[in-house]
Amino acid sequence: MKKKISIERISAELDTDRPIWAAVGDLCCRTGDGGDPIPNERWELFTRIWIEPYRVLMPEWSYVALADRRVVGYLTGCPDTARFARRCFVRCTLPLLRQVVCGRYRGDAYGKRFARQTLRLENRAERSFPRPIRRQLLRQFPAHLHMNVDAEFRRGGVGRRLIDRFIQDLRQRRVSGVHLFCGAAPVPFYTCVDFHELAVISVRGNPVYAMVLRL
């Protein structure tokens, strides 16, 4: 029997939604390698990079898809990427960088890459786009999102419903547009939910797309 899916916005009360955030982090790691799981030993660092900033800084701009109260999809995002990035650097990135440099994640190549990117010794995918493109994204499409759906629940409309709810709330705030970065595989899905390609570059031999939606 098909399970009923509900879409819920996470509250700003961290204690209330702590189990939800744990489930979001778990799903992030189970889908973090192009939809497939990442190695178990990388889970803690991976969630600190990709989930913690949203949990700490803007939990109210994150959403979950629930089936029988189980998290089967999530969307993390914010309405103002430039402001979010400044706060994230101070509150999340710098403390994590200190721990990486001091050896907390010794042996994790992902930790080394995070440190190199934070110190601007290596560009993150989004910083590899030409400066005019990055400026256009922040000016015309200031919101951004990340999203993952459990493999069992893909192609069932869960992703579209998460995005629709996020966009509805952005429009209430009169945000002008939203962007995201992704590889080649999700492009057809995002095209189906009205995003279009603004630019594409190659990063370490793989295409990275900047997808945008004007609100």
What is each model feature region?
Residues 1-19:
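Conserved N-terminal entry element of GNAT/NAT acetyltransferase domains
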Residues 5, 69-74:
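Glycine-rich phosphate/pyrophosphate-binding loop shared by adenosine-nucleotide-utilizing enzymes
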Residues 18, 32-50, 91-101, 105-106:
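Conserved GNAT-fold acetyl-CoA-binding loop/helix
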Residues 39-62, 68, 76:
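Active-site rim helix/loop that mediates acceptor-substrate recognition in acyltransferases
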Residues 81-146:
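Conserved acyl-donor/pantetheine-binding loop and adjacent beta-alpha core of acyl/acetyltransferases
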Residues 141-143, 147, 170-183:
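Conserved GNAT acetyl-CoA-binding A-motif
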Residues 146, 155-169, 192:
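Conserved acetyl-CoA-binding loop-helix of GNAT-fold acetyltransferases
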Residues 176-187, 197-215:
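C-terminal "cap" of GNAT-fold acetyltransferases
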